[in-house]
C-alpha cells in the first residue's frame, strides 16, 4: 500500500517539488501509525554536494502502539541511515508478526549539509484511520526555536577536543531544543544552522568584517532556502499560517559574539537585529 505524504504527520518546515516532499532542517521529519508487518521509504539526497563528513543523516524510531506523543519516543533509533545515495531505500519497520506501531523519521543532521526528500512510502498493512486527524485536532503547545549549532545537536555524539565535525555525530533529537519540546509534549519547529548569527557567522579573532554569507535574517523568512537553491528553485517565503507557534525561542548570539566582542557600534547592530 502506497502512502501519500499528505496522509502523514509532519514535523518542521517542508516543501513539495516534483512529487517529493523535502525536509532538511534539524528535527524535521514525519510520523505514521500503522498495523502491519513492514514499512519502507525512498529518501532522496544530494551526496554529490557532500563529502564523507557532511552527508544527510536520518533516524527512524519505532514504538509499539498508537501513541504519537513524544512520551512514547524511544531513547535510541531503531534504524539510522546515512544518505549515501541520490535515492536511498530505507526500511522503517519490519516484523514477522503483524503489529500496531508508531513510526517516526527524524532528520538528525542539519540543513546546510545533505538534504532529505521523501519520494515514496509503502507499507504492508494499513494506516491507522484516526492518527492524523487526532494529531491535527489536539491542542498541544506549539514551539518554534530559532538557533545555531546547539539547536542542531552539533557534535553531540563526538568526543570533545578529539573528534572533528561530521554529520554522523549530530543528534537533533538530543539537542536542548528537542528535549524541551519532549518535556512540554509540544509540537516543534526548528530553524537552525551551525555557526549562524544575527549579524555575523562565527569568525576568528583577527577578522575585521562580519561574515554575512548566511545570517538568520537571510534564512528564517524562507521555507528552506538552502535546499531550494540546490534544486535550482527560487526560495519560497515561509507561510507562517502553516505553523503558528504559541512560543518562539531565539537562541542566537554565541556566533555574533565572535565578531561583536565589546565594540559598542557592533553591539548596537546586534541589538537592532533582534
Set out the residue ranges of the language-model regions.
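N-terminal secretory targeting modules
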Residues: 1-146, 150-172
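Active-site neighborhood of glycoside hydrolase catalytic domains
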Residues: 270-274
Amino acid at each position: 500500500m502506497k502512502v501519500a505524504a499528505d496522509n502523514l504527520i509532519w514535523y518542521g518546515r517542508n516543501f513539495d517539488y516534483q512529487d517529493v516532499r523535502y525536509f532538511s532542517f534539524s528535527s524535521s521529519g514525519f510520523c505514521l501509525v500503522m498495523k502491519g508487518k513492514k514499512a519502507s521509504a525512498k529518501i532522496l539526497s544530494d551526496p554529490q554536494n557532500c563529502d564523507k563528513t557532511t552527508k544527510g543523516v536520518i533516524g527512524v524510531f519505532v514504538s509499539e502502539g498508537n501513541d504519537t506523543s513524544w512520551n512514547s519516543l524511544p531513547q535510541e533509533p531503531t534504524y539510522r541511515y546515512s544518505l549515501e545515495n541520490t535515492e536511498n531505500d530505507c526500511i522503517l519497520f519490519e516484523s514477522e508478526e503483524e503489529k500496531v506501531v508508531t513510526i517516526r523519521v527524524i532528520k538528525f543532521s542539519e540543513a546546510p549539509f545533505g538534504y532529505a526528500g521523501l519520494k515514496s512510502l509503502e507499507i504492508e498493512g494499513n494506516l491507522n484511520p484516526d492518527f492524523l486527524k487526532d494529531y491535527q485536532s489536539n491542542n498541544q503547545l506549539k514551539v518554534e526555536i530559532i538557533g545555531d549549532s546547539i539547536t542542531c545537536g552539533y557534535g553531540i555524539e563526538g568526543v570533545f577536543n578529539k573528534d572533528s565535525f561530521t554529520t554522523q555525530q549530530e543528534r537533533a533529537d538530543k539537542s536542548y531544543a528537542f528535549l524541551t519540546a519532549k518535556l512540554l509534549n509540544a509540537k516543534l519547529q526548528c530553524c537552525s544552522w551551525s555557526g549562524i548569527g544575527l549579524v555575523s557567522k562565527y569568525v576568528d579573532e583577527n577578522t575585521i568584517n562580519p561574515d554575512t554569507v548566511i545570517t538568520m535574517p537571510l534564512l528564517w523568512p524562507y521555507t528552506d532556502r538552502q535546499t531550494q537553491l540546490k534544486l535550482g528553485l527560487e526560495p519560497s517565503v515561509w507561510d507562517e499560517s502553516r505553523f503558528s507557534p504559541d512560543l518562539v525561542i531565539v537562541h542566537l548570539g554565541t556566533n555574533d559574539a565572535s565578531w561583536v566582542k565589546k565594540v559598542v557600534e557592533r553591539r548596537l547592530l546586534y541589538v537592532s537585529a533582534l
